Amino acid sequence: MQRRIMGIETEFGVTCTFHGHRRLSPDEVARYLFRRVVSWGRSSNVFLRNGARLYLDVGSHPEYATAECDNLIQLVNHDRAGERVLEELLIDAEQRLAEEGIGGDIYLFKNNTDSAGNSYGCHENFLVARAGEFSRISDVLLPFLVTRQLICGAGKVLQTPKAATFCLSQRAEHIWEGVSSATTRSRPIINTRDEPHADAEKYRRLHVIVGDSNMSESTTMLKVGTAALVLEMIEAGVSFRDFALDNPIRAIREVSHDVTGRRPVRLAGGRQASALDIQREYHARAVEHLQNRDPDPQVTQVVDLWGRMLDAVETQDFAKVDTEIDWVIKRKLFQRYQDRHGFELADPKIAQLDLAYHDIKRGRGVFDVLQRKGLVKRITEDETIEAAVDTPPQTTRAKLRGEFITAAQEAGRDFTVDWVHLKLNDQAQRTVLCKDPFRSVDERVERLIASM
């Protein structure tokens, strides 16, 4: 499947600092954030004009699920659009707090852990054919996903009883299973709950919940692009060396704690391999696969950055990727800050900087400051991100959903939508079932819109 439906779901961390005496719980802050949404959507679980879903998840975490995308740049644009949507809610909520005499600054973090040790996720979704052998996909993907943090982790300072240590991944410490149907209780690497949001006879949805939330556009593209390419190779019958892990949960933590990528992890049967070895194998197969597939500049870009990042890890010279990969950007930032101020990695100011890197408010968040200074590479433009805030992808089913929502809102009609249904809540209860996520034109939807 060279054209694939993909999406990213991001849960955001929330906190608020107060200027006055009255303090609000995270639940109350979340309610302020979503007050504007509830006022027009009558719910804290809504679909937007750009086809995305916005809702309040378990534990007062706002969650943004992008619309269905079918190429990587489009997906990065819609992922970044989610930050803008949440930033607008943040600004609106701060104004409401001020009007009510509760002075406070609200912070939304696109990260995966809070100071209390709780974790919240960034989930990737990939459409796969129902006909394929799902267990083979899981078997081949698992070693890739366990070691993928080496190339696209968000980076984190982990405070251990002995000392502070820099880790590649925020999510690795919170994963407890390889493949499972649960998402919160056991936090697997791959979630197998079968909810295709499409024709269940043709498709299923691969739900990857091990990844970090990325600030860097290049890292987001690399994270999703490499996974999509490995999936494509599995479907094409490409054979890989057997890297089945003896204990994926131990391995994911060992890999996260080793920025050299050389620490051996145990494979099934007693063999050993490093994260660098494993990623080199997948990358080598990808380079070969590119010779046999239709040319795609985005995929070529992904394979190029993948190779450059592995070279950087091998040589420990990150100069050629230090504007593109989150954990490299962050580690360089920490090292400069430590050198300038003489801080240890365990200093609370480093932890503060770690958190501020993920602050999505423009002009305040550290990543945004680096971006404005030209210290991180971009693959999108502000104009295309702003467009994605209100406009759905034009090549997928999201276009139908977005057009229906826009038309219904402008006509003042009551409606209900989800990923596959578009329904007018009138006497006739007319509903269109959109089971094909690749289809962006549908006469039934056009007729439904025209009837408003």
UniProtKB/Swiss-Prot annotation:
Entry keyword annotation includes Nucleotide-binding: yes
EC number assigned by the record: 6.3.1.19
GO molecular function, one term: magnesium ion binding
Signal peptide residues on this chain, from the entry's feature table: none
Pathway noted in the entry: Protein degradation; proteasomal Pup-dependent pathway; Protein modification; protein pupylation
UniProt-annotated binding residues for ATP: R53, T66, W419
One of the protein's GO biological processes: modification-dependent protein catabolic process
Pfam families: Pup_ligase
Binding site for Mg(2+): E9, Y55, E63
Entry annotated with the keyword ATP-binding: yes
Active site annotation, chain numbering: D57 (proton acceptor)
Keyword list, A-Z: ATP-binding, Ligase, Magnesium, Metal-binding, Nucleotide-binding, Ubl conjugation pathway
InterPro entries named among the record's database cross-references: Pup_ligase, Pup_ligase/deamidase
Catalytic reaction equation(s): ATP + [prokaryotic ubiquitin-like protein]-L-glutamate + [protein]-L-lysine = ADP + phosphate + N(6)-([prokaryotic ubiquitin-like protein]-gamma-L-glutamyl)-[protein]-L-lysine
Function: Catalyzes the covalent attachment of the prokaryotic ubiquitin-like protein modifier Pup to the proteasomal substrate proteins, thereby targeting them for proteasomal degradation. This tagging system is termed pupylation. The ligation reaction involves the side-chain carboxylate of the C-terminal glutamate of Pup and the side-chain amino group of a substrate lysine.
Note: The reaction mechanism probably proceeds via the activation of Pup by phosphorylation of its C-terminal glutamate, which is then subject to nucleophilic attack by the substrate lysine, resulting in an isopeptide bond and the release of phosphate as a good leaving group.
Family: Belongs to the Pup ligase/Pup deamidase family. Pup-conjugating enzyme subfamily.
Entry protein name: Pup--protein ligase
Native source organism of the sequence: Rhodococcus opacus (strain B4)
Protein's gene: pafA
